[in-house]
């Protein structure tokens, strides 16, 4: 029997979303945990599935906050890495009146795209029923190469 139902690799970041206006009429922003792969895991965890996350955050206070939120949700964080040089990725989210959203990412680079192949524990892939990854991991070379490395058929068997 496999240890996990789903393991996800990808971005874990802060989504800043508008939460009202200040007394001066300026937009007030709220910091929320974000990143599609972890969002998927959080919902699966609520459905009683065993989940684990593989990714990277900054060693800053935001990265530590995210690690705590993910762990508190019951998601295994043994493969969550911290980058001491690159900050946690930020996304500013604008929601339109029709509910559509627009994202502005602040990562050049961001910690989530700095997960290298040598930081990925291949054994966890063999111990899961399903491996999920986010598309943003494919947009930057370091994280793309890590994903390609871990996704090779010999590692997924």
Can you describe what each PLM-predicted range is?
Residues 145:
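Glycine/Thr-rich phosphate-binding loops that ligate phosphate moieties of nucleotide
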Residues 50-135, 140:
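Conserved N-terminal subdomain of the carbohydrate kinase-like
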Residues 1-76, 115:
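Glycine-rich phosphate/adenosyl-contacting loop at the front of the ribokinase-like
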Residues 3-5, 89, 102, 153:
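A residue-level signal for beta-strand positions that form part of recognition/binding surfaces
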Residues 148-157:
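Single conserved hydrophobic/aromatic residue that forms the stacking wall/gate
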Residues 44, 139-141, 150:
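Low-complexity, intrinsically disordered/propeptide-like segments
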């Amino acid at each position: 029997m496999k240890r996990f139902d789903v393991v996800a690799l990808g971005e874990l970041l802060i989504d800043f979303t508008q939460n009202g206006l200040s007394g001066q009429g300026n937009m007030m922003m709220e910091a929320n945990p974000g990143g599609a792969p972890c969002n998927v895991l959080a919902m699966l965890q609520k459905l009683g599935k065993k989940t684990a996350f593989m990714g990277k955050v900054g060693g800053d206070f935001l990265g530590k906050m995210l690690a705590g939120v993910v762990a508190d949700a019951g998601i295994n964080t043994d493969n969550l890495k911290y980058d001491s040089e690159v900050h946690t990725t930020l996304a500013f989210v604008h929601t339109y009146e029709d509910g559509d959203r627009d994202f502005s990412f602040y990562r050049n680079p961001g910690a989530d795209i700095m997960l290298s192949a040598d930081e990925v524990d291949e054994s966890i892939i063999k111990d899961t029923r399903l491996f999920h990854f986010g598309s943003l991991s494919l947009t930057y070379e370091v994280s793309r190469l890590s994903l390609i490395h871990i996704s090779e058929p010999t590692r997924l068997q």
